[in-house]
Amino acid sequence: MGFRLFVVIIIGCFVLIDIGCTPPIQTLEIYNNGKPKFAREYKVISSGLGPDSITVKLIQYYRNGMQHYQQEIMNKQANGKYFSWHPTGVKSAKGRYLNGELSDKWTWWGKDGLPDSIRTFRKGMLHGEYIDYFVNGKPHKLMEYVENKKYGYYKELDEKGRKVSVGEYRNDIPHGHWIWWQNRIKTRELTYENGLKNGPFKIYDKLGKKKILGQYKNDKKDGEWNWFSNQKGLDSLIVYDNNQYNGEYKIWHANGNPAVTGYYNNGLKNDKWKWFNKKGQKDSIKIYDTGQLFGLATIYYDGRQPRKIMTYVNNKLHGKMTSFYRDGTTESEITFANGLRSGSYKFLDSEGNNEEEGAYLKGNLHGLVLRWYTTEQLSSTAMFSSGKLQGLMRVFSPSGSTMKEGYFFDGLPVAIFEYYENGRFRRILSYRGNEIIQEKVWAETGAEITTPALGIRTKSNVHSNGNPRYECTYKNNSKHGIEWNWGEYFDLQSLNIYDQGLLVLKRTWSAPGVPNEDILFPGRSKQVIIGPYSSAG
């Protein structure tokens, strides 16, 4: 609804229309088609025109000659009744002015003659009844104003006349009990106090059944709140204090069994919390302190047998975490510190046999890592430093034979030794970073079948009995590749690997097949000493 009112007083050369006993009318302005645009009714004080007459009504016309509005005038300002019409002659507004200001009840109509709105004024301000209508002429919003502010009842209806909301205002802000509907079904109830939510709060589903019950205090959630579902009734329960979770907390599964129970303190999880599966069996138990996991936590298979037991400190795993098979036997033990794997760990099969054992440091593998086959036979050993292979890595066959030995530094290979089941060499690879700089290959019988490489020459000598004593490959007069030393009876005593004259690996044996000491980058700042028990320095 919009309205615009004009009060026009024009002084000049007037055209008088004398219609006998009717009030005299004076045309003030005409359209270019000769029809009047503005006119006035006046009252003659003595005789003559101008100062001898006063305007008592202003009239405006449409171009088609139909009246637009009439406004009564007193004391040279709008005073009295006001009427207006649409160009078709259908009334559009009715009201009155007092001393130039809107006053009392005003009504507006649409072009079809149906009501559009009603307003009530006092001294130009909204004061009293206020109504908006739909285009079908039915009320839409009904309320009251006091001195331009909503004050009192409020009602909103849909186009079919059904309630949408009911409440009240005080000083232009919501106050008191409010209710909302949709298609005649109540959807929400809320109580206000001077614009703040204060008191019971209810939400209903599409069937009108309760969905949420709670309350507010000073615009903040307070006390017990309940959530409901059609299938199971009470769905969850939470206690608030000053808009924060504070107290008991419960959630239920669709079948009515509990899903979660716990406690809040000032909005933070506290004390023991429990989770349950749909059968009502315990799923997990955790302890909280001021919102952080702190203490023992247990995860279950079926409410009785633990699946995992662990400890938290300041919301981070700390100490030993143990996992179990369904029969209760240990599956793994892992040590944590400040949320990271740090310390010893091991994995076992369902029969209690070791599968893997080692240690972590700040989340990375560090130290010796052992792995087993399903039996008690080792499958591999490896040394790590801060998550990278460092030192010796060995791989064994199920029968216990060494099948592979790898020497690593900072995660990169230095040399790889591969063996046949009978213990003889199968292949030796020398590396510079990830690049292979030499490869030696043997048949299972012990015969070398290496493909000759360009630029590589070999120096060697033998014992007096004809057995090999020494052999080394060179590149550009520098030792490059493998250097061998054998005893008189072909027992390997040492093996060195060079990279263009630089010694990168030194291996020695105290007896045939018995390693003594291995050294990576001997004599250099990054030297790594590997003893017969595969311990790196």
Predicted regions mapped to residue ranges:
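Bacterial N-terminal signal peptides
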Residues: 7-18
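Bacterial N-terminal signal peptides that target proteins for export
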Residues: 1-7
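Glycine/tyrosine- and acidic-biased, solvent-exposed loop/turn segments at the edges of beta-strands
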Residues: 18-537
